[in-house]
Amino acid sequence: MLRIAIVGAGGRMGRNLIQAVQQTEGLSLMAAFEREGSSLIGTDVGELVGISPLGITISACLAEKTADFDVLIDFTRPEATLEYLKFCLANDKKIVIGTTGFDENGKQAIKQASQKIAIVFASNYSVGVNLVFKLLEKAAKVMGNYCDIEIIEAHHKHKVDAPSGTALSMGEHIAKTLGRDLKTDAVFERYGIMDERQTNQIGFATIRAGDIVGEHSVWFVDEGERVEISHKATSRMTFAKGAVCAAQWLANQPQGLFDMTNVLALDQL
């Protein structure tokens, strides 16, 4: 039985993760955490998600549960994730990271930690989105050098980072396939009078509105035609199930930094 702990348990993703773990054979939810001072501290996680009590209450202290779990699943914020990462590193725990919005220092900290512990770090845990990454690589090989490429993403109004980590990953997959650097090719803002678009640019557009779970569309545009590769998520359970799948896969891995390409064996396609 693989023992799971969840941080950010009271959030939208956290609640879906609790349900996903409970629905998955071979997994046992052993601990759930929220930030210090949260009104949810002491709440039974079963009652939190509308099922029967599970006898597991939300805590603020990981140290109290060190011996209780094998893999930590984290969908919080970068500053919190890096603290949880330090805990996992100090206690030889594996971690699935779904947090996005890290700066270069944060990404480097994750990379360094992976030299000692096993980590799955992905911008999106949807199976469909990760399949889209592969499709984008195929499209970029055929059309990327002569088409204009634009990435449009939409999320709920509470999402704080933009563009989404998934949109950036899409751009990175395309740029890498073309032998280019996204840092120099990306255009994140267009306003007012500006120079004519350059073919090497990869444009990003962001929408934040209502309760949109997550939508991404990539356009490859040439004179007279446009190819669109799109993905729409209608439930966060899609991401939760993917993260749980990643935790199961991670249980059999030594130290190292992995993503959903590894988990789903997409390189074999």
Swiss-Prot record:
Which cell locations does it reside in?
Answer: Cytoplasm
Question: Which residues are listed for NADP(+) binding in this entry?
Answer: R35
For this UniProt entry, what is the primary localization, expressed as one broad class?
cytoplasm
Q: Does the keyword NADP apply?
A: yes
| The keyword Aminoacyl-tRNA synthetase belongs to this UniProt entry's keyword annotation | no
Q: Which domain of life is it from?
A: Bacteria
Residues that hold (S)-2,3,4,5-tetrahydrodipicolinate according to the record: H156, G165, T166
Quote the Pfam families the UniProt record gives: DapB_C, DapB_N
Among NCBIfam families, the record links this protein to: dapB
Tell me the GO BP annotations in alphabetical order.
diaminopimelate biosynthetic process; lysine biosynthetic process via diaminopimelate
GO CC entries: cytosol
Provide the catalytic activity annotation.
(S)-2,3,4,5-tetrahydrodipicolinate + NAD(+) + H2O = (2S,4S)-4-hydroxy-2,3,4,5-tetrahydrodipicolinate + NADH + H(+); (S)-2,3,4,5-tetrahydrodipicolinate + NADP(+) + H2O = (2S,4S)-4-hydroxy-2,3,4,5-tetrahydrodipicolinate + NADPH + H(+)
Which amino acid positions bind NAD(+), per UniProt?
G8, A9, G10, G11, R12, M13, E34, G98, T99, T100, A122, S123, N124, Y125
Molecular-function annotations in GO:
4-hydroxy-tetrahydrodipicolinate reductase; NAD binding; NADP binding; oxidoreductase activity, acting on CH or CH2 groups, NAD or NADP as acceptor
Keyword list (alphabetical) reads: Amino-acid biosynthesis, Cytoplasm, Diaminopimelate biosynthesis, Lysine biosynthesis, NAD, NADP, Oxidoreductase
Please give the name of this protein.
4-hydroxy-tetrahydrodipicolinate reductase
What's its job? Catalyzes the conversion of 4-hydroxy-tetrahydrodipicolinate (HTPA) to tetrahydrodipicolinate.
Tell me what organism the protein belongs to: Haemophilus ducreyi (strain 35000HP / ATCC 700724)
Q: Which family does it belong to?
A: Belongs to the DapB family.
Which residues are the active-site ones?
H155, K159
| EC code | 1.17.1.8
Pathway(s): Amino-acid biosynthesis; L-lysine biosynthesis via DAP pathway; (S)-tetrahydrodipicolinate from L-aspartate: step 4/4
